Amino acid sequence: MALTYILFQVAVALLAILTYYIHRKLTYFKRRGIPFVAPHLIRGNMEELQKTKNIHEIFQDHYNKFRESKAPFVGFFFFQSPAAFVIDLELAKQILIKDFSNFSNKGIFYNEKDDPISAHLFNLDGAQWRLLRNKLSSTFTSGKMKLMYPTVVSVANEFMTVMHEKVPKNSVLEIRDLVARFTVDVIGTCAFGIQCNSLRDEKAEFLYFGKRSLVDKRHGTLLNGFMRSYPKLARKLGMVRTAPHIQEFYSRIVTETVAVREKEHIKRNDFMDMLIELKNQKEMTLENGDVVRGLTMEEVLAQAFVFFIAGFETSSSTMGFALYELAKNPDIQDKVRAEVEEVIEQHDQNFTYECTKDLKYLNQVLDETLRLYTIVPNLDRMAAKRYVVPGHPNFVIEAGQSVIIPSSAIHHDPSIYPEPFEFRPERFSPEESAGRPSVAWLPFGDGPRNCIGLRFGQMQARIGLALLIRNFKFSTCSKTPNPLVYDPKSFVLGVKDGIYLKVETV
């Protein structure tokens, strides 16, 4: 009886401690006088996530609620994690660029011991991130992009051949799937040196696992929220985010690719070559003069994985959304086609690396697509030390606090981009761009932790779109969704039921 009473008292005490702890968490901003929206006990301000709204819409609603306030940031509960939700562009610039040294970390969950594929450049923090970023920076120079360019064009030419075969048989095509197959074949070739053949093989393995990697999770929304809110505890508990079949597939592919290349002394001037070269360097000298070891096999695996996933989803989605807008705006499409023809003619009918730089209007189309359809909705940062917002002494970001910069919401702010839901490439003319802060456009982030692969992603999308528009005319049809319906279960900007367009040869 006494033991039961003691256990009951212990349980009551633990419950009281837990209740107090959660109460302190959920009143975090109230106690500091920071504007916020009352959170759900468990889901915080993410209550509608995967029910009726995707994360883009949740962030957009929160941003719109406080957009005209004078607050540089407001409170947002990412599940139970209180985050500083940035409203002011000047604060965004301070965090991303001027005071980057205090905000270089992201605070995202990863577990290099139990889930090595998760310890990639996108997730890592501190000295690990800095070291890896320095090691990999040389792999994405313009010179390296020029070496990969012929490979991308070769895949793009095969894409055109497949399209010419498909169009006479069926003029209405689901365009998102087609551009996804193109990007999978490009990245499979450039990252792994493997002919994926997804353009012709309906059941291509790389395409299947590329899509599943973005959908299949080991845990549901609540456990993923727990890992996000308590990353250190989740790591100590040995929690893993990557689904086992995804882990097994990429581990096998990377291990086999490295083994074959090293045994046969194969050189392809691609991303995998660069990773193997870094792996085999016992010592390497960084730009700052530090001498460090090369990459481990686990680091090679993680970087190859994130290169594939990031390049596949962002490039294919951007191309799909661009074609959708060009189909709805035939005058813009005609202008792009005329520019492509003119530029190729200037280069003696050769689609050279220099051509992509001369396609000024096409680049504006891509920039506007990335604004209107921002694939990843936000940038994550975490404060290393207590930070008083310049000019706002009552707004303090505490050490260890998460920061959310809602890039997609910023891209749809009418005070920055008038009529933000209209597709207007002229916004990115040199004249209009000069009138906006650089941090008003953040599809690749900004500052020292911007997207390391942005050059490759842009090159791939430019080549694919230029050749598609040169060879085909895209228009809307009865199956074209208007407006687009987004998938609430997708973290990246995903469309339900695809994008159907009418396609004709030019």
Curated annotation (Swiss-Prot):
InterPro entries: Cyt_P450 (IPR001128), Cyt_P450_CS (IPR017972), Cyt_P450_E_grp-I (IPR002401), Cyt_P450_sf (IPR036396), Insect_CytP450_Detox (IPR050476). Its cofactor is heme. Keywords: Endoplasmic reticulum, Heme, Iron, Membrane, Metal-binding, Microsome, Monooxygenase, Oxidoreductase. Heme binds at C451. The keyword Transcription does not apply. GO terms for cellular component: endomembrane system; endoplasmic reticulum membrane. It is found in: Endoplasmic reticulum membrane; Microsome membrane. Coiled coil: none annotated. Pfam families: p450 (PF00067). GO terms for biological process: insecticide metabolic process; lauric acid metabolic process; response to caffeine. Its EC number is 1.14.-.-. It is a peripheral membrane protein. Belongs to the cytochrome P450 family. PANTHER family: CYTOCHROME P450, CYTOCHROME P450 6A16, ISOFORM B-RELATED. This is Cytochrome P450 6a8. The lineage of its organism: Eukaryota, Metazoa, Ecdysozoa, Arthropoda, Hexapoda.
